[in-house]
Amino acid sequence: MAVARSSRTDAARPRTGAEIRDAFLAFFEERGHKRMPSASLVPEDPTVLLTIAGMLPFKPIFLGQQERPAPCATSSQKCIRTNDIENVGRTARHHTFFEMLGNFSFGDYFKQQAIEWAWELSTGVFGLDPKNLVVSVFRDDDEAEQIWREVVGVNPKRIIRMDEEDNFWASGPTGPCGPCSEIYYDFKPELGDDGIDLEDDDRFIEFYNLVFMQSNRDAEGTLTPLANRNIDTGMGLERMAQILQKVPNNYETDLIFPLIQAAAERAGVDYHQLDEKGKTSLKVIGDHSRAVTQLISDGVTASNLGRGYILRRLLRRVVRHGRLLGIDKPFLQAMGEASIALMQSAHPQLSERREVILAELQREEARFLETLERGEKLLADVLAAKPKQISGEQAFELYDTYGFPLELTQEIAEEHGLAVDLAGFETAMEQQRQRAKAAAVSIDLTLQDAIDQVAAGLQDTEFRGYEQLEQSSSIQALVVNGEPAQSAVAGDAVQVVLDVTPFYGEGGGQIGDRGTLVADGQAGDGLIVMVESVSRNRSVFVHSGRVQRGALAVGDVVHGRVDRACRRRAQANHTATHLLQAALKQEVDPGIGQAGSLVSFDRLRFDFHCPRAVTAEELERIESLINGWIADAHALEVQEMAIEKAKAAGAVAMFGEKYADVVRVVDVPGVSMELCGGTHVANTAEIGLFKIVSESGVAAGIRRIEAVAGAAVLPYLNERDAVVKQLGERFKAQPGEIIERVTALQDELKATGKALAAAQAELAVAKSAALATKAVAVGDFQLLVERLDGVDGTGLQGAAQSLADQLGDGAAVVLGGLPDPADQGKVILVAAFGKAVIAQGQQAGKFIGGIAKLCGGGGGGRPNLAQAGGRDGAALASALEAASHQLRESL
């Protein structure tokens, strides 16, 4: 029996990238899946440089190394892949950054249910015609083939068996593995079902991959059934957007094309008028802009190592392709702004990290531009000699002297039909390594590179900060002004590694301690370093600050003193965070889990999984409950125990966090028990007071509460009281009368707004009377396309309808304008069509929606009257010209 399809109408089906993402997650959430947030692009898995697949955050669960958060889950995971970076922009579907939609079963449902849901989602929710779909199965997976054919009802000719290379997944040479089944979209179903070749990328696109983890492979290669079978699936968001938005490639979807338009505007070009080379450059800029923005947001900084090198390479490719398009001024910040604006609704952390992102983009672009021009000139001189290839020595000179990445040299050489002598390059590189090693010189290290270098050869730092706030220690290593060093003097920015420390290193959401390092046994004039932050590199604690007086050197003994006031505030906020999670579980939902946190000296922030907003009444009860626990003066109990014992005792662990076999348990008896390595008060009474500042949503299914505790509460209340007093003075009202005064003012503004809108509508209609004379005859029809600024959407609709009424059944009226001429970021477009125009096959809703895309927007409405909007006022004139041209051609 075939699986039934949904009756959802075309209008109700998702189209935009955001709608597709939400529809996918909602579909599986409705079927019992726990909606999980996207993990960072910087993975917990030390064997992987970046998050490359939607299943990566769940890999420890699939491998039996971590408990499952729920029987099944769904997510939209940020991913980065750079293994085929040379294909980005040249093919329809290759990207560096992309989102992978997925549904996962951890020993819950299996093959048949996964297949049925995949088909229901594809044909029902997304409305794909089964005649346009082809499925692949592993060559030996008779069960999957039978389900597709007999249960789902797929035409047997459209079920293709594939080899192990294409349709079998394994976690490694040994371990969990299983067959795959994929769903492909057929862009040319008219070619028939005979001889289907899924390698034909022009005809087929794979958009949904189902992995059935059903076996364990031993060292002999023998497969045995797994006790708990799992499901791992992945649907490319960009690919589904291409299919549903009916565009020729992923780049022209609403997920990327606004960035291409932003780059084209910077270059002063029209994407659709460019040759393939120009389009490729715009696609590279659009793709890489998303990638670098997300990488920086997740904490990656440009460097010459690891993921930092990937970021640097992507940034430099953007600059390079910008120059190919004629952009000779810095523009990375502008692309960063555009990327944040495009993606922040789905990824709110981008707006929170905006300043960091833009600063890194500006800094790295400036650094590259300083050397790029000289490097390009040298390469041009090399190419002018018309060599048969670029020698390894020449490529290395560009890399070593001018900071020119080898990949960039290869790209430019390829554009001229040349190759680069890679073997010669490696020889020159190795010779340089040997010279550097002999001279003991580290070249072009960023601060993080330098810290990584010095920390790599050191033993773990012994942390004694739970018991004491002062400690004498030996300096193990120094980084001075971004370089490994043996000594430092007054004025130097330093990172100090000690063998023993009382300073807490940032971790578990809690920021690192502040304090001082002084010459051992001295004070006052003996002050050496003001410690501003403490971080961890693996288990090596790095104390960052600036030398105030004197000098220090590797091997010196210093005395560390933690700032007691800062530590007390951090402790109060951290314990308050535990109480907050306990109160949320008690008052809102016992299943609430932590999604992230920040414990600083002056505030706390707690992110948690919750499908709805916490009500004002619930927040009031939570606040009261926490202050009650504080007043009850609970003495905290802290102990170390085996993780199995801790979990059996009910200790709360954070999903995604890695724990050792022995863990530290912080217990507020009868209230809260959590696995935690942070610092805490000895008694809840030390917190003093707790006050919630705000509750908000930060992502789908993720809520955030911000609060203050302890010494930070009184300044917060004083600040609020000052605001109330200022409002009272402004409104000439007592505090208790302010709400009444504001409500009256809102009512007055609302009435004034209505009157203004009515006046604008009347004015627009009056203006339109003069426009009617500008209508031109196109056969039996009257065509009028005009610009009318300073009128809102309601007024523009009224004007268009008035003009259509005047011009009769053959009227085709299109009006566009900027409601506020000073704001180029808001465009209004309206179409009004008479009965004869509609009978000709034109519909105002579809027509104006298409025109609005030229202004970076969209919209629609009824066949006779419709409105759309856009974000690019500079494109309005060309959009109106396009509207006139299209109507002249079709009428």
Curated annotation (Swiss-Prot):
GO terms for cellular component: cytosol. Coiled coil: none annotated. One of its GO terms (molecular function) is ATP binding. InterPro entries: aa-tRNA-synth_II/BPL/LPL, Ala-tRNA-lgiase_IIc, Ala-tRNA-ligase_IIc_anticod-bd, Ala-tRNA-synth_IIc_core, Ala-tRNA-synth_IIc_N, Ala-tRNA_ligase, Ala_tRNA_ligase_euk/bac, DHHA1_dom. The keyword Cytoplasm applies. It comes from the Bacteria. It is found in: Cytoplasm. It is an enzyme of class 6 (ligase). It catalyses: tRNA(Ala) + L-alanine + ATP = L-alanyl-tRNA(Ala) + AMP + diphosphate. Binds 1 zinc ion per subunit. Pfam families: DHHA1, tRNA-synt_2c, tRNA_SAD. Its cofactor is Zn(2+). The keyword NADP does not apply. Its EC number is 6.1.1.7. GO terms for biological process: alanyl-tRNA aminoacylation. PANTHER family: ALANINE--TRNA LIGASE, CYTOPLASMIC (PTHR11777:SF9), ALANYL-TRNA SYNTHETASE (PTHR11777). Consists of three domains; the N-terminal catalytic domain, the editing domain and the C-terminal C-Ala domain. The editing domain removes incorrectly charged amino acids, while the C-Ala domain, along with tRNA(Ala), serves as a bridge to cooperatively bring together the editing and aminoacylation centers thus stimulating deacylation of misacylated tRNAs. Catalyzes the attachment of alanine to tRNA(Ala) in a two-step reaction: alanine is first activated by ATP to form Ala-AMP and then transferred to the acceptor end of tRNA(Ala). Also edits incorrectly charged Ser-tRNA(Ala) and Gly-tRNA(Ala) via its editing domain. Belongs to the class-II aminoacyl-tRNA synthetase family. This is Alanine--tRNA ligase. The gene is alaS.
